[in-house]
Amino acid sequence: MGKGFLDCESLVALQEMALHPIDLTASGCLSEERIQKNSLSAEGFTYSYATERVDDRCLEALQGLTEERELIKQMECMQQGAIMNRIEGFQSESRPVLHTATRAWVRDQDLHEEAAAIARHSKEEALRLAEFLYIARAKFSTLVQMGIGGSELGPKAMYFAMQGSCPSDKRIFFVSNIDPDNAAEVLREIDLEQTLVVVVSKSGTTLEPAANEELFRQAYQNKGLSIAKHFVAVTSQGSPMDDKSRYLEVFHLWDSIGGRFSATSMVGGVVLGFAFGYEAFIEFLQGAAAIDAHALTPKMRENLPLLSAMLGVWNRNLLGYPTTAVIPYSTGLKYFTAHLQQCGMESNGKSISREGKEISFRTSPIIWGDVGTNCQHSFFQSLHQGTDIVPVEFIGFLHNQRGLDCVLSGSSSSQKLFANLVAQSLALAQGRDNANSNKRFKGNRPSSILVAQQLSPRIAGSLLAFYEHKFAFQGFCWGINSFDQEGVSLGKELATQIIGIMSGNAPVEFPEARGMLRLFNVLT
């Protein structure tokens, strides 16, 4: 849609500006006026980008780029069910992208055709979930969720995000890795009779959950317990797992819901509803749905995910920074960056356009990070004085979740936490001169700060959707398909062949793999 990324007139202007971006170390640069002007408050968040290397001219050009690339129109098309997961002229999944429809039913929205159908089915599944939870929460004390990728990362991140603000007497575990030690660790911790096992696989054939399900089924058989009374499936209709004779209950999702965008479907619904109750899950959906609507705001400087996306494009494509660090100053978000790695890098780590052509510019940065203040004492040395400049996205909250705090030396721990967040952003931006070169901080290291009052279920849902839409906007801008993941398939295909060699049933010759296996089998 619109002009190609490299054909945009705004990009030419931005390239000129990138030669001499604003100097954040200049005296008076971070004035009160700039701080107030370069901020946006919406949907329970305040977003500060005064410490990014942008000025009004740059922001106007970025707005122009959003218009030339028709980003809002593309977002509208996505939410209404257009075929956004496609590569023109080549075999591809050719599907709509409708994770937003899984939460659209909690607010009034005029949806078309398949989007309306997915919203309707999502409501039906949610109502079935409410009935199921009424019985399951009374009967079971523990839940184990089995899944890989988006079937684990998003739900796990959101479970821990909500854990501090939602009282719960339930124990939750996640099993994802095909490494049997992962399953063994969890089996040691649980009472099988009190445990509900949720197996998540859209296709019903995913290797990792299939292997782990078999390990758990064997454990239940060895205990003489009924498997069908303890196991729940979340899968597509008609998949091999869509079998009520093998499961206590089967919940459904659809082809148009990508794994990394599935936390607001039953992929996240069963575990979050079991852990915190159905109402907490609905609050979570409401937060996500609010950002879905907000993401359609036309003006970039009034649209949280669009603004963040375009600042990311500026940092990646114009200033040339290869990585982005996401640093939440919240223990509840300790698994959130891992989810963002998948959501961002699996979506936009592409080198082919939607027209099937090789592209000649940078796409997704490497996304990484950890929880503050912990990481201030590990990799922040490199952020401040290393040879690579790393844009940082700080996330913070004014109040902690659990209510426990103390005052030491005149300030609470929550105040100290937030003070450190702000201090790091300013230190990166302004730096500090010193005659001792070892103590010199050059500054001009960009960052942004996203703050909410407290990490609640609603804010967790909004934060999830904020980043989903940020990455979608960036993919739209670059003209790539953010909704497939062909890069996952080659390694899986080769692994299947190597498993055949190891089991003595190799379907094809694979001398390189045999050579590798001979090298390492010497250790046995």
Curated annotation (Swiss-Prot):
Family matches, as PROSITE patterns: P_GLUCOSE_ISOMERASE_1, P_GLUCOSE_ISOMERASE_2, P_GLUCOSE_ISOMERASE_3
CC annotations in GO: cytosol
Top-level lineage group: Bacteria
Gene3D superfamilies named in the record: 1.10.1390.10, Glucose-6-phosphate isomerase like protein, domain 1 (3.40.50.10490)
Subcellular location(s) per record: Cytoplasm
Record pathway: Carbohydrate biosynthesis; gluconeogenesis; Carbohydrate degradation; glycolysis; D-glyceraldehyde 3-phosphate and glycerone phosphate from D-glucose: step 2/4
Keyword Protein biosynthesis carried by entry: no
A molecular-function term among this protein's GO annotations: carbohydrate derivative binding
Single GO BP term: gluconeogenesis
Reaction catalysis annotation: alpha-D-glucose 6-phosphate = beta-D-fructose 6-phosphate
Keywords: Cytoplasm, Gluconeogenesis, Glycolysis, Isomerase
EC number: 5.3.1.9
Chief location: cytoplasm
Residues annotated as the enzyme's active site: 346, 377, 492
Keyword Cell inner membrane: no
Alphabetized PANTHER family for the sequence: GLUCOSE-6-PHOSPHATE ISOMERASE
Function: Catalyzes the reversible isomerization of glucose-6-phosphate to fructose-6-phosphate.
Family, similarity comment: Belongs to the GPI family.
Protein name, per record: Glucose-6-phosphate isomerase
Organism listed in the record: Chlamydia trachomatis serovar A (strain ATCC VR-571B / DSM 19440 / HAR-13)
Gene this protein is translated from: pgi
